[in-house]
């Protein structure tokens, strides 16, 4: 009887171990089956189709974004060139009417203010038509050549929007960021709280290169700058610099 009892006890002791092994075996079989199903789906492309579709959609969106950016930059370049030509013609007409040479504008703040007022219209019209936050021109003259670093100062007019929200131009206020105080008052322009009468060309990327341009085609003198922080503001911008030529082809300043 003892051998039979011992055999029964050994069988009972082995029972849970065999059950655990059977459960583990079934679990492994389920994992293998799931792995086989996933491998089949991936091999047939069922699972990869959404990924390919997403990748294609992103590629199309990227191409559309680049195309829209190129189109906008081309439009801005064309508008800036047209404005530069108008500024050059107005400058020639102003000097002819005054009977003075360009360099005689130096140290003559009243005449400079009068010129800035005349050049306001093409500047303002371009700002209203272009998709940009501001626009300005700088001429190679200054109201006071005796100031320190006077060689860096440029008489000019800088108009910008008071708010940079993406709204239509007619819904935004235009303020004077740079320009003679007399000009701003005569045009009834609000002056920026960090207003200055003239531009500092040393702080404008690309201005030296543009004013040194000696080519015959205005388009060849245009220059897009890298993204840069705009002085006295929190705004970061890309600048398009275009030379301003007089009737003789001499560079008299730059428009941005």
Residue ranges of model-derived segments:
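Extracytoplasmic/periplasmic sensory segments of membrane signal-transduction proteins
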Residues: 77-211
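Non-catalytic regulatory/interaction regions at protein termini and inter-domain linkers
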Residues: 1-20
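Extracytoplasmic/periplasmic ligand-binding sensor regions of membrane-associated signaling proteins
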Residues: 179-255
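Residues embedded in well-ordered secondary-structure elements
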Residues: 69, 124-126, 228-233
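Juxtamembrane extracytoplasmic/periplasmic/luminal helical "stalk" adjacent to the first N-terminal
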Residues: 16, 20-112
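Structural recognition of the beta-strand scaffold that forms the well-ordered cores
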Residues: 136, 255-256
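Sequence-level detector for tyrosine residue identity
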Residues: 8, 25-28, 66, 120, ...
């Amino acid at each position: 009887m003892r051998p039979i009892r011992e055999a029964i006890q050994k069988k009972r002791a082995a029972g849970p171990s065999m059950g655990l092994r059977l459960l583990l075996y079934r679990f492994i079989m389920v994992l293998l089956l799931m792995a086989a199903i996933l491998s089949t789906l991936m091999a047939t492309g069922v699972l990869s189709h959404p990924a390919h579709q997403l990748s294609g959609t992103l590629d199309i969106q990227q191409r559309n974004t680049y195309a829209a950016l190129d189109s906008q930059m081309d439009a801005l370049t064309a508008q800036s060139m047209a404005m530069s030509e108008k500024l050059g013609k107005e400058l020639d007409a102003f000097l002819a009417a005054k009977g003075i040479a360009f360099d005689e504008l130096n140290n003559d703040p009243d005449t400079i203010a009068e010129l800035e007022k005349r050049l306001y219209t093409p500047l303002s019209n371009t700002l209203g038509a272009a998709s940009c936050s501001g626009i300005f021109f700088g001429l190679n003259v200054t109201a006071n050549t005796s100031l320190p670093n006077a060689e860096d100062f440029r008489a000019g007019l800088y108009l910008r929007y008071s708010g940079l929200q993406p709204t239509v131009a007619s819904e935004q206020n235009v303020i004077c960021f740079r320009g003679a105080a007399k000009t701003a008052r005569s045009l009834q322009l609000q002056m920026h709280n960090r207003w200055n009468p003239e531009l500092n060309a040393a702080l404008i990327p690309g201005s030296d290169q543009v004013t040194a341009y000696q080519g015959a085609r205005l388009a060849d003198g245009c220059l897009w700058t890298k993204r840069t922080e705009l002085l006295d503001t929190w705004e970061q911008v890309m600048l398009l610099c275009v030379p301003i030529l007089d009737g003789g082809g001499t560079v008299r300043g730059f428009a941005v």
